[in-house]
Amino acid sequence: MDTFLVTERADMEARGWAELDFVLISGDAYVDHPSFAPAVIGRYLESKGYRVGIIAQPDWNDVNAFKKLGKPRLASLVTAGNLDSMLNKFTAAKKIRREDDYSPGGEAGHRPDRATLVYSNRMKEAFRDVPLIIGGIEASLRRFGHYDYWSDTVRRSILVDSKADVLIYGMGELQIIELAEALDQNRFEESLPNIRGICYMSKDIPSIDCVECPSFEEIKVDKMAFADAFRIQYDEQDPFYGRPIVQKHGDRYVVQNVPALPLTQEQMDAAYDLPYTRKWHPSYDDKGGVPALSEVQFSLVSQRGCFGSCSFCAITNHQGRIIQNRSHQSLIDEAKLMISMDDFKGYIHDVGGPTANFRHLACDKQAVFGACKGRTCAAPEPCENLNTNHDDYIALLRKLRKLKGVKKVFVRSGLRYDYVLADNNKAFVKELCQYHVSGQLKVAPEHVSKRVTTMMGKAGKEEFLTFKKWFEEANRELGKKQFLVPYFMSSHPGCTLEDAIELAEFLRDQHMYPEQVQDFIPTPGSLSTCMYYTGINPLDGKPVYVAKKGRDKAKQRALMQYKNIENYDLVKEALIEANRRDLIGFGPECLIPPRPIGQGKVQNQGRKKTGQSRGGQSRYARSGSPSQVNKTKGERKRRFTR
């Protein structure tokens, strides 16, 4: 019989429990799978002997919905879920999404805006004397004063506004156990300065070696102060050399302790070897379950962390740059568990993490001294000390595909092709194409302008073209017809109209036709978001061009889909503005024909439209493929949560 964590009073009674130690409020539907953070935290606490219950997506208008499992003995836990609740609800154009893959039946509207704040207020109303701990991606990335794109304002730390006692940042397993032990031993408050990976409020600056960044009051009115604060926070996010950070809010301080140490391989194995049912809670059966599970139910998380340091990605600020991997045996055991499930069809959908082929530390130094301050490991140029060996990842994939009951093992999470090139490993590409590509391999060049890719922290155009050549050569040798599917992004800070035109010309020359494109979304806590808000690169203090006006962003977006008749006026306006009339005409180099703006809009109305964008939330392009690119639900938001 599958056993879920407690969700109802009847579950408590069946176990003979009069009360719970922790009640966890989640903005996501309850899915008991290791890709869903509430399940991981709940199971981890359970494994240490604590009694845990989950209230998933409670009615935030009714305080009684938060009381249904009774008063917790130790603490209330609150998370918005696997995504920031505002990103979950709104597109880059600030339009409401029609679906929510983390809710039953994919229905939108089951969580409030700024869910961490709303849930926290309700739990304080329900149990005022019970300690409140917040965590998850929303809390983690809003732990300092931050820019909020959806309100276009600088907001206070979510710790201040939620009135929580503690904020856990990062992945949370080690922190929650330390906090649980401190609560259980009645030494909660005195323990706070000594627990890594948490934030708390203090009336005074702690009497330890710490660094103070500009206050909330300063960053709210001064963009240079905002950039300085971000730089300090960015530089101290290493568990080996990072110092505690304080930021004044009014007459109190937000204190961030040093980051939690990376999990050992044994700890990683333990976290993923817990007795997850790998299913959504049966209470969702009548609505067809929870769509987000379909993407990950038969996938394996082999590691955490990413040393790619993409500027727009939250991983550095949440999981860190130091890779934490699982043992082959742990992954094989999980694969065997999946094989035994009735609905397993023989396909392991993915083996990876934030980046599929980052299976080990970037270099040996990281294990002792941490990731280098002020330097990146992989891009725009790989560090001379970067360990690019792919042997461990290849060995893992070989073991998995030999398991009885496995027909195919796919690699679908982000593959860093520049890392493959640094390894000069054509054999890896050929083996990947032979056994682990399902017709299309997704990669993320994001842009081709050197100026833009440098701002993004990505490899350049040349690396993408080299990998594309390797990929095509491998498939020719194998006699396979497989396609490279690149992600591209518009309107990233630093991207001018000229850069957008350069990308359009590249797409023309490479015969790529983007069916869906992604506008940059300034999510809290990222380097790119700091650049977007301030117009400053906080790492060097230099000004950065930012396309903020809707018309300017629309022109960059339209250039990526210049063949769409609906985009004609925007593309022509952009080309004239950039003095690129040479691209208007009938020649092979031209992007559009020279008809007047506003005419010809009825042309091709009878033709079936395919691959239209949906509010800027996704990005796919075809490379010479005549077929429609397939996209599963939930995939469009994965890269913001990895």
Language model feature labels by segment:
Residues D165, A271, C306, L331, ...:
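Conserved, mostly hydrophobic/aromatic
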Residues M1-E19, A29, M224-S299:
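N-terminal [4Fe-4S]-dependent radical SAM core
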